[in-house]
From Swiss-Prot:
Family: Belongs to the LeuD family. LeuD type 1 subfamily.
Annotated keywords: Amino-acid biosynthesis, Branched-chain amino acid biosynthesis, Leucine biosynthesis, Lyase
MF term (GO), any: 3-isopropylmalate dehydratase activity
GO biological process per UniProt: L-leucine biosynthetic process
EC number of this enzyme: 4.2.1.33
Protein name, UniProt field: 3-isopropylmalate dehydratase small subunit
Known partners and oligomeric status: Heterodimer of LeuC and LeuD.
Role of this protein: Catalyzes the isomerization between 2-isopropylmalate and 3-isopropylmalate, via the formation of 2-isopropylmaleate.
CC annotations in GO: 3-isopropylmalate dehydratase complex
Amino acid sequence: MEAFNTVTAIVAPLDRANVDTDAIIPKQFLKSIKRSGFGPNLFDEWRYLDQGQPGKSNEGRPLNKDFVLNLPRYAGARILLARDNFGCGSSREHAPWALQDFGFRVIIAPSFADIFFNNCFKNGILPIVQEASVVDSLFAEVAAQPGYQLTVDLPAQRITTPSGRSIAFEVDPFRKHCLIHGLDDIGLTLQHVADIQAYESKHKGQAPWAFLD
């Protein structure tokens, strides 16, 4: 998993509440269990005017020119500004996979669905909860300033706006550690390989049936 320290990037405003995981990545794309390759179909039913199909190129598909991610001013955005209850619906981990594969590293919203919130941390995305009034002010600033960027400093737990306004945010210390060091569940386990091997060596004689080669 890519380590997270500080991100300075364009902000894309998705001004909709209750965005569910089926909107983030529609159900027909869930056949793959690889983490990569979902970005082109992120928000597929909103980005395109026809229905996408797994395994088919998006080249030539008619775009919804009014959708935020199709607007030139938000090209290359890595920070997503959202509304309440982002990531609700089914627990599919494909949703953060699609967001990460598209390029997003940060999502700022007043609230998130619990499972989606947890899955973001496991996939290198920092979900930041802010008061609705703060989110409202950021939406207004993004709308007023083309090319609007935020700097998100995870070690300092600070968001900095173009005007220099500093906004603090909370993050669980363990999750912060994992993001800064690029540790997903597998990475965390691999940090304890020596302990795991020592345990196996100690217990093989007592329960050899549990350690079949």
